[in-house]
């Protein structure tokens, strides 16, 4: 059974009329009367996902990151106001134990596409359209990468996300659970991880997001340092983002107040963000949004021996996701 399955998987694709580009499908491309053919004449959107993700190369079938807890604040040792009696035990150090966290697994998925062209169409076509087909195939592959990379952010910026990250919470949440649940003295750690501001982009919500950035905590609830330096917005918020971060005067007023947000953040306009009233800030150096190339786009071509049909295909393999929610703070309406 396995051998038969492998034979089926490895069997070459036989060209058919329906799957092959033929002269009869593009008859006008064989005639010299056309002034211009509109194909592959538009500029491609530059690569954007690499401005957001840490782009890495993988040599394994999957990549796994692992989180652990953290030590809690020390407890008092002894009593400075009294002497230990002869029959009383001396103070003892309270030893802590860090707890295991959660795995973050990146499983690389495969993507492929291609096209076929009959021999005489290659010979007779007069406008170099066929020569442009491989270029457009590569362009379509790059577009697929952009669509995939933005998907978890578009999902997280929804009013009610349905997809969660490794900790069973949306990427942007008020209640990210911490690994450690008890302090060294046995009391409950009540702090939760919070990286969400409810509301639309404004001077007030942006200030609130930056303030929240100073309140980020580790897995034991201890304050940590994150340097939020970038505001990522959809095209619909580009001009507002520029007003908030680039103008000298306070936006929206005729007073001579200074704009305290000026120069505080770089702005990235991510054309593939679809939620027009939501955005996020990020620490571009310390965030853990990762994109792994297992196989970068690889292209090949061959001629079918019997049909003389020319085949072109491309293949790529990658994964992406988050190893930590820290490093991102969302600003979005909650309804």
Regions flagged by a language model, labelled:
Residues 102-161, 231, 312-314:
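Long, contiguous amphipathic alpha-helices that act as assembly "spine/axial" helices in icosahedral shell
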Residues 43-111:
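Assembly/oligomerization interface modules of large self-assembling protein complexes
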Residues 13, 17, 24, 83, ...:
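Amphipathic, alpha-helical segments enriched in basic
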Residues 35, 99-100, 216, 297:
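Short alpha-helical segments and helix-capping/turn motifs at coil-helix boundaries
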Residues 2-16, 28, 169-219, 225-335:
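Sequence/fold signature of self-assembling virion shell proteins
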Residues 70-76, 82-86, 93, 105, ...:
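Signature of extracytoplasmic/envelope-associated structural regions
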Residues 1-56:
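Extreme N-terminal leader/anchor segments
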Residues 154, 158, 219-224:
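Surface-exposed acidic, glycine-flexible loop patches that form ligand/cofactor-binding
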């Amino acid at each position: 059974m396995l051998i038969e399955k492998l034979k089926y998987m490895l069997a070459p694709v036989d060209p058919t009329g329906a799957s092959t580009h033929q002269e009869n499908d593009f008859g006008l491309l064989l005639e010299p009367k056309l002034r211009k053919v509109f194909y592959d004449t538009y500029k491609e959107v530059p690569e954007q996902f690499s401005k957001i993700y840490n782009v890495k190369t993988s040599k394994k079938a999957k990549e796994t990151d692992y989180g652990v807890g953290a030590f809690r604040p020390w407890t008092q040792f002894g009593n400075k106001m009294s002497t230990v009696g002869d029959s009383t035990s001396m103070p003892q150090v309270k030893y802590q134990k860090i707890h295991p966290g959660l795995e973050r697994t990146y499983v690389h998925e495969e993507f492929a596409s291609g096209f076929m062209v009959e021999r005489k169409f290659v010979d007779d076509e007069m406008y170099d359209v066929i020569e442009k087909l491989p270029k457009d195939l590569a362009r379509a592959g790059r577009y697929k990468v952009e669509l995939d990379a933005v998907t978890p952010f578009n999902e997280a910026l929804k009013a009610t996300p349905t997809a969660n990250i490794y900790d069973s919470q949306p990427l942007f949440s008020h209640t990210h659970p911490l690994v450690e649940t008890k302090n060294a003295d046995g009391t409950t750690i009540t702090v939760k991880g919070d990286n969400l501001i409810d509301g639309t982009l404004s001077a007030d919500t942006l200030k609130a997001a930056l303030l929240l950035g100073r309140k980020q905590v580790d897995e034991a609830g201890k304050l940590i340092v994150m340097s939020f330096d970038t505001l990522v917005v959809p095209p619909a918020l580009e001009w507002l983002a520029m007003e908030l971060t680039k103008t000298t005067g306070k936006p929206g007023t005729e007073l001579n107040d200074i704009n305290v947000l000026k120069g505080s953040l770089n702005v990235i306009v991510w054309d593939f963000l679809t939620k027009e009233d939501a955005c996020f800030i990020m620490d571009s150096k310390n965030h853990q949004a990762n994109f792994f190339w297992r196989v970068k786009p690889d292209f090949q071509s061959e001629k079918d021996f019997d049909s003389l049909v020319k085949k072109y295909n491309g293949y790529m393999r990658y994964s992406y996701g988050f190893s930590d929610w820290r490093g991102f703070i969302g600003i979005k309406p909650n309804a």
